[in-house]
């Protein structure tokens, strides 16, 4: 799935054709964190990326993130216990996008762009109408330099005036790429003010 997000629209197109329901809304959940081959592996991260990209290829579709709905002890639990919030988040998509209840927020922060400022990476996001929740430490960020080796950020802070996240690592004096929760198992802690999580992302294409 690393390079084949088109698999998803082909599947949905077939289902819609078989059911004869036109562009029936297709809302789905991002696969949850799980240590398929160890915590530092990235295979599942590429699948999540393909899921996210599939939204732009499938008309009338949307995805929820689940990367904050697992506990550290669930590292080898492929079906995490917290099912209620998964259902709630899917219902938010339906209520907002299908039934037009726009007062119900259905999207968490999504990566928009980033800029290098010296040794710091300044990252901006879409869907920040309610800002970023400051009740959590911002963990899960990594930064890489020209050697393409990613290091955990040792300093992450929120520039609240612009809602940008500023990331740096002492091991990376000149950042060229940023990743967030781009591992098989990494629990997300960056939550929007609407209590919805940030979609895992990477800025590189290596």
Predicted regions and their residues:
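Catalytic-core region of carbohydrate-active enzymes that cleave or remodel glycosidic bonds
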Residues: 2-62, 85, 93
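C-terminal beta-sandwich/jelly-roll accessory domains of carbohydrate-active enzymes
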Residues: 122, 128-206
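Short, contiguous acidic/charged loop-to-helix segments that flank catalytic cores in large enzymes
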Residues: 2-3, 77, 81, 153-157
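Composition- and surface-driven signal marking solvent-exposed, interaction-prone regions
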Residues: 1-6, 41, 137, 191-195
């Amino acid at each position: 799935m690393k390079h084949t997000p088109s698999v998803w629209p082909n599947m949905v197109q077939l289902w819609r054709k078989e059911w004869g329901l036109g562009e029936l809304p297709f809302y789905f959940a991002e696969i949850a964190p799980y240590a398929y081959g160890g915590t530092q592996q990235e295979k599942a991260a590429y699948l999540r990326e393909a899921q996210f990209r599939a939204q732009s290829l499938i008309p009338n579709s949307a995805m929820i993130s689940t990367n904050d709905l697992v506990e550290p002890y669930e590292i080898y639990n492929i079906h995490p216990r917290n099912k209620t919030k998964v259902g709630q988040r899917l219902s938010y998509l339906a209520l907002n996008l299908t039934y037009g209840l726009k007062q119900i927020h259905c999207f968490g922060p999504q990566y928009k762009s980033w800029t290098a400022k010296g040794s710091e990476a300044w990252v901006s996001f879409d869907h920040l109408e309610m800002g970023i929740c400051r009740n959590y430490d911002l963990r899960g960020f990594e930064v890489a330099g020209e050697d393409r080796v990613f290091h955990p950020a040792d300093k992450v802070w929120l520039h609240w005036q612009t809602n940008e996240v500023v990331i740096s690592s002492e091991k990376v004096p000149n950042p060229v790429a940023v990743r967030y929760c781009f591992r098989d198992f990494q629990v997300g802690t960056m939550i929007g003010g609407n209590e919805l999580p940030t979609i895992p992302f990477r800025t590189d294409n290596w």
